[in-house]
């Protein structure tokens, strides 16, 4: 319980730090949100009136204190552009980005684990060299370019989906998920290649260990040794990579949502930055920071589940 309480306290402190830094940065960067909303022909009187309405005439620390008070009540402020609560605005976009993240991560697991194990078991063979060569190529290609290729070949030529024909989750759930498969694949492919390379290296390093030879000497089959002994230890460093991958998927979805014309959090973030809609930008940044911290916490817990030698007690690893 102490460990969980410590992690929860760390979550709150990190979110407050992220929110303060972003709040301070938005207050010092050039430009005025009120001028951006009214346009270049607005009179000084109208700009001043809108600044007062937005609360921009108050000191930065006072505005931040008001934001923190609202944050603990689930209020992230009001959007300048949409004139609606930021929480409601983000809530409509979260399911889209979360669905892309889940699909992409499941793709990474489904592809990287079997291929990583296979290449480790056949290290130095023809298929291993071919797969690792393809890995290098895929890792060097940006996700947005893969997204463009998928749109061209699978969308325009093979007609597997219609580019730009996004269907919301409320209209048709199956079509909604189906349309998100393409951007998820574009995000997942480079990360699949990296995960395969990492898992292969981790498995190979474990296969030369003394406990593996001991397991074979006791009459265990190669399959049992791999899945009950080697893989358990090989997954520990890969877990950290997978944890970081989820945060990376969320970050890359910002670009891929533009390529596939998907109205998710990424599209909202870019639009809000362009419009200087800082409450929305800050709300999304805090949400992403919370996601990263929660994922790291989950990874810490999984360490102890996979390897009993790693124990977490009272916030300390023993």
Predicted features by range, described:
Residues 2, 94-128, 172-318:
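Alpha-helical transmembrane segments of integral membrane proteins
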Residues 11, 93, 97, 133-136, ...:
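Residue-level signal for discrete positions within transmembrane alpha-helices
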Residues 15-65, 158-179:
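Hydrophobic alpha-helical transmembrane segments of membrane transport/permease proteins
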Residues 16, 20, 136-149, 241-246:
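Hydrophobic alpha-helical membrane-insertion segments
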Residues 22, 26, 30, 34, ...:
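Membrane-water interface at transmembrane helix exits
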Residues 52-61, 76-86, 167-180, 187, ...:
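Membrane-interfacial helix-loop-helix junctions in multi-pass membrane proteins
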Residues 57-113:
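An internal, D/E-rich "acidic patch" concept
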Residues 133-197:
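Membrane-water interface segments at transmembrane-helix boundaries in multipass membrane proteins
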């Amino acid at each position: 319980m102490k460990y969980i309480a410590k992690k929860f306290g760390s979550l709150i402190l990190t979110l407050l730090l992220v929110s303060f830094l972003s709040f301070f940065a938005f207050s010092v960067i050039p430009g005025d949100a009120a001028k951006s909303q009214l346009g270049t022909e607005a009179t000084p009187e109208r700009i001043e009136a809108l600044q007062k309405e937005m609360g921009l005439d108050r000191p930065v620390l006072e505005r931040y204190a008001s934001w923190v008070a609202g944050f603990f009540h689930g209020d992230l402020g009001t959007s300048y552009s949409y004139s609606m609560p930021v929480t409601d605005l983000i809530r409509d976009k979260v399911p889209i980005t979360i669905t892309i993240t889940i699909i992409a991560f499941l793709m990474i697991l489904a592809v990287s684990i079997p291929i990583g194990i296979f290449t480790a078991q056949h290290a130095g063979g023809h298929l291993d060299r071919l797969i690792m060569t393809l890995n290098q190529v895929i890792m060097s290609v940006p996700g947005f370019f893969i997204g463009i290729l998928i749109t061209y070949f699978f969308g325009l030529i093979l007609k597997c989906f219609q580019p730009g024909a996004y269907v919301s989750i409320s209209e048709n759930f199956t079509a909604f998920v189906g349309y998100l498969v393409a951007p998820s694949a574009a995000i997942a492919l480079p990360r699949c290649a990296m995960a395969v390379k990492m898992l292969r290296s981790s498995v190979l390093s474990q296969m030369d260990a003394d406990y593996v030879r001991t397991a074979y000497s006791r009459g265990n089959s190669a399959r049992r040794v791999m899945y009950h002994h080697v893989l358990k230890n090989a997954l520990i460093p890969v877990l950290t990579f997978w944890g970081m991958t989820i945060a990376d998927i969320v970050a890359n979805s910002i670009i891929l949502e533009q390529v596939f014309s998907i109205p998710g959090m990424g599209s909202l973030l870019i639009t809000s930055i362009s419009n200087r809609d800082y409450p929305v930008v800050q709300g999304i940044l805090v949400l992403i920071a919370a996601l990263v911290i929660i994922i790291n916490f989950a990874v810490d817990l999984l360490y102890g589940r996979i390897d009993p030698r790693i124990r977490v007690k009272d916030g300390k690893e023993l």
